[in-house]
Amino acid sequence: MKTLKTLKIFIIVFIASVSLASFAGFGESCSSLPTTSDGYLETDTAYGYIIRNIDMKDPRGNCNSVASSITFCFKNVEGSSSPCTMYTLNEGDSKKISDLSTDNNPDLGANPVLKNIVLTVKKWDNDLCLVMPTSRGPMPVACKSLSATPTPPPSEDKNCNIGKSCYTGANYSQSLINFSGLAVQCLSETLNKIFFAGKSCSAQDQNSRITNLAAFSTFQGYLKRIIGAALILYTMFFAFNMALNTEYASTEKIALFVIKFLFVAYFSIGLGPLDFSGGQPTKENGMLKYGLPLLTGAAPDFAQMIFNAAGSRGLCQFDNSKYKDGYKFYGLWDAIDCRIGYYLGLDLLYNIDKNRVLGNVVGNGPRGNNTPIPNFDPEGKNDRPKDLSKAGALRFFTVMFGFFMAGNVIILAAGLVFSVIFLSILLYFITHYLVCMITIYVMTYISPIFIPMALFTRTKAYFDGWLKVCISCALQPAVVAGFIALLITMYDSAIFKNCEFLRYDYERGDIRFSTFELRLPVGGADKCQESFGYKMLEYYAGKGWEEHLLILFPIKSIVRDVVSILAELLCVLVFSVIFYYFSKSIGRFASDLTNGPNMDAVTASPTKIVGLVKKGAAFLKDAAMASQGKPLVGDKPGVGGKRKEGEQQGGDLASGSGGGK
């Protein structure tokens, strides 16, 4: 009997053990899981507890390496009909533990600490794993091997060092001619990738010619110990002062100590981890979260605020509400690009939809006369040059050539000088803004070096200098923008006088743009018709051109309103020369006003550009004289000979006086 009972107990224990092994081999994975060196996650956190409640080695073929899904058995509550419930999740699927514990297991799905943990299926090296967030980053709780090494997905950002807006930035502009806003956005995104993104190009990319700097977080890590030592020294010095002087124990001193301590820690190495998004602990750095956006955003905001107060009524004034979020700064640069195109006679900005092929438009602005002025499709269009009919042509230079063919060289010279000075001043503003933006990014990148210097009296001057440069670079573009706004106001008043402009807004998918149509004001229409800008638009339309025969070749020139055009253009030229000479000191004025560095040495100043134009003109003149066999100006006896003779006499006198000593 005893033998029979013993055998019976043995059979029951064997069956129970086999069933437990078959249906509840919890904590087993098809592939080995990574382990931590101290075993902390596996023993003392929810990570190890969840591993011990998952079974993968079930007799149902869960370890199949061909399937692109993962199957596992999740433990049920004690006393359930089945020890666990099977689940199959595809790659990329995510489930909360509360969704997997269908029977409200109080140890899992109903546990307030565990129920909101998200399990995600993703590739982990050569395995497909069920991953959960931990304090040390995402970690797998169950894995299986794949049949072959997966091919890495192609990177979405093929141009890893170049901002995406360098290729798509034109879609955010409302001006049909846009290059300055595109340059600003392209440079901003590229600097952000180089300094802060922390994603370098693949080592196999042989076409890459730009090497990323270490990411800002990596750079912070290098200085973490140094900054920590500075904070410890600061605390020790303050404690010594409190022990030796009771005045340091006051509430004011203690509050100032705490504020400076937190300021340096938050803006230099960051506080945290404050965010566990995706299980990855991240630090919150005040310089990246508040400092950089504030400094880079202040420059265009101040500049646009001043710039929008200038200009003619309705000309190149875009609707700011139609810019996408994060791209409203394009309004400033669109206004500049639009005026460049409008002053130089770009047809696209004026009559883009004369055949109404774009559908409905919305007109905004003062309407005045309801007839478009002038008519861009005159009956005598055969008299005008063919260049005026080309889309996208800069008609200003075609009209200047028409005056030249009529013998009006002074008008041609005045027009070319105006265009060179106007473009050089605007180019100076653009380059000045870009240099200031680059400086702000560099100052932000090296901020972990200078911010801790605010703790000590002997090093605070370095911090003050760093802060001074940052604030100055944020304000200098606003000062230069005020100068440009005044220039634009004077140009609009001199060129278009009291003319008004009607804006037409177009939308084609995600692309939005506007054109501007000149309209006569209700009162004082004669003054607008006598303006230089109105007459130039008539020339662009083909009015005022005459055809003549020069020997055997027909030429087209402009002989109408020559005197009035010359007077108006000379008035514009006077303003241009005044602003040209004033632009020589605007950079120094902006630096003195903001108490920062002078950027003229690294910008395209108008004087440099005009100097290059002068050198080019002198070179062409010398080349023309040399081709005709004439002596150059410096080789003439009446000029160069006297100068050389005087130099020789001066040298003889100097040598004679030296010998007499």
UniProtKB/Swiss-Prot annotation:
The chain crosses the membrane at residues 226-246, 254-274, 410-430, 436-456, 469-489, 562-582. It is found in: Cell membrane. This is Uncharacterized protein RC0143. Residues 629-661 are annotated as: Disordered. Keywords: Cell membrane, Membrane, Signal, Transmembrane, Transmembrane helix. GO terms for biological process: protein secretion by the type IV secretion system. Disulfide bonds: none annotated. Pfam families: TrbL (PF04610). Belongs to the TrbL/VirB6 family. It comes from the Bacteria. One of its GO terms (cellular component) is plasma membrane. Residues 1-24 form the signal peptide. It is a multi-pass membrane protein. InterPro entries: Conjugal_tfr_TrbL/VirB6 (IPR007688). Its main location: membrane. The keyword Thylakoid does not apply.
